[in-house]
Amino acid sequence: MTDVKKNENMTFEEAMKKLEEIVEKLEEGNVPLEEAIAFFQEGMKLSKLCHDKLQHVEKQLEYMLREDGELVPFSPEEE
């Protein structure tokens, strides 16, 4: 199974955990350049996966609200 297929089957939480691990490794700063590039590429794929999963959930929530006759567009609160 390729890394892409593995990533597609990950849950949001698994992808976030793996992304956090990659960030920690890169922040340590003692990773060889080639390995750092590979980590960065994997991190970008995981970031996109998480973003796509969040967008999917957002659309599901908007659809559920529409079924109840009320549509409130998703708008994240600013912290």
UniProtKB/Swiss-Prot annotation:
Alphabetical list of PANTHER family matching this protein? EXODEOXYRIBONUCLEASE 7 SMALL SUBUNIT
Going by the record, the broad EC class of this enzyme is: hydrolase
Q: Which family does it belong to?
A: Belongs to the XseB family.
Keyword annotations of the record: Cytoplasm, Exonuclease, Hydrolase, Nuclease
HAMAP family attached here? Answer: Exonuc_7_S
Enzyme Commission number: 3.1.11.6
Question: Which reaction is the catalytic activity of this chain?
Answer: Exonucleolytic cleavage in either 5'- to 3'- or 3'- to 5'-direction to yield nucleoside 5'-phosphates
What is the protein's quaternary organization? Heterooligomer composed of large and small subunits.
Q: Which GO terms describe its molecular function?
A: exodeoxyribonuclease VII activity
Q: What does this protein do?
A: Bidirectionally degrades single-stranded DNA into large acid-insoluble oligonucleotides, which are then degraded further into small acid-soluble oligonucleotides.
A cellular component term (GO) from this record?
A: cytosol
NCBIfam families noted in UniProt: PRK00977.1-2, PRK14063.1, xseB
Q: What is this protein called?
A: Exodeoxyribonuclease 7 small subunit
GO annotation, biological process: DNA catabolic process
Record localization: Cytoplasm
Q: What species is given as this protein's source?
A: Geobacillus kaustophilus (strain HTA426)
